[in-house]
A protein has these predicted regions:
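Outer-membrane beta-barrel proteins
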Residues: 2-302
Length: 302
């Protein structure tokens, strides 16, 4: 099935590649449907100071996909996405896996409703500490990034506030209609979300914020995982400074109140090569083990 999905994406890319890459907006009309091809290739070397940690070449976090939009009336359109994650690690196991696949209907008046495998609203509303390419972001307490068998609704008001609601509906033994649900809102870089994983008796809630002041950026999150036996609080903060619009220096810290977790310090430097490529070098320092993991590589997006 994964190979079939990949072949379909490759075929779509071949069909639209010439006009798409000739268009600055990367959009082409195919039988009155706007098709946008997007992706990212990220390759890096990862090593560390722990015993037995040898340098390793990785291509994780790469992706390829297409998005569709068809305006069938002046006020309403249908949209969708089909995408895969690609990890060309050479071991022949799970190199290509499904990322998202959904269809939906949207209008400026009523909002957007989609069904399928969608991205979690908690990740986009709260998880503001995900600023690094291959490091950090280990303290966030949230629902899974990818939600299969889900229904997702979002509506942006005239004043710019976006409200979101999402549920996961699985045919499981517990006979619950909504196996997981979450609601949230975001406005000008600040977001809040509450989620309830009914099947596993876990609730999540959190707040995240991201701000830029000229060359200075600041982002972070506070989140909680609440189970029947214990609560885990996590927080992350990341600061950045951009030099001449090409070089960004990042520093971050994340921690939870879980036993044995003293936190993680992360640093990195990102250097832009044009508008679509970034050279990066990053390092994680674990305050528990006093070991570090470093990475250096290149990411290209389109």
């Amino acid at each position: 099935m994964n190979k079939n999905i990949f072949c379909a994406l490759v075929a779509a890319g071949v069909i639209v590649s010439a006009p798409v890459f000739a268009n600055d907006d990367d959009v082409i009309d195919v039988q009155n449907t706007e098709v946008t091809v997007f992706g990212e290739t990220r390759a890096f070397v990862e090593g560390g100071t722990a015993t037995g940690k040898d340098p390793e070449l990785k291509t994780s976090y790469s992706k390829l996909g297409v998005k569709y939009n068809n305006q069938f009336s002046p006020l309403t359109s249908v949209f969708g996405e089909l995408s895969v994650d690609v990890d060309i690690n050479g071991d022949g196991s799970d190199d290509i896996t499904s990322r998202f696949g959904y269809v939906g209907v949207k209008s400026d008046l009523l909002g957007a409703l989609s069904i399928g495998k969608t991205s979690s609203i908690m990740d986009s509303y709260v998880n503001k500490g995900a600023q690094f390419k291959a490091s950090g972001n280990g303290s966030i307490q949230q629902t899974p990034f990818k939600l299969t068998n889900s229904v997702k609704y979002e509506k942006t008001t005239p004043i710019g506030v976006t409200f979101g609601a999402q549920s996961q509906m699985l045919d499981g033994a517990t006979d619950e209609t909504f196996d997981l649900w979450q609601i949230g809102a975001t406005y000008q870089g600040v977001g809040v979300t509450y989620a309830d994983d009914v099947i596993n008796n876990i609730s999540y809630y959190g707040i995240g914020a991201s701000r830029s002041y000229g060359p200075i950026s600041a982002s972070g999150s506070f989140s909680v995982q609440d189970t029947t036996t214990t609560d885990i609080m996590g927080y992350e903060v990341v600061g950045g400074y951009t030099i001449k619009e090409t070089t960004t220096i990042l520093a971050g810290y994340g921690d939870t109140d879980a036993t044995g977790d003293d936190g993680l310090i992360t640093g990195g430097v990102h250097y832009k090569l044009g508008s679509d490529a970034v050279l990066f070098t990053e390092i994680d320092y674990d305050l528990d083990t006093e070991e570090s993991v470093y990475s250096a590589g290149l990411g290209i997006t389109f």
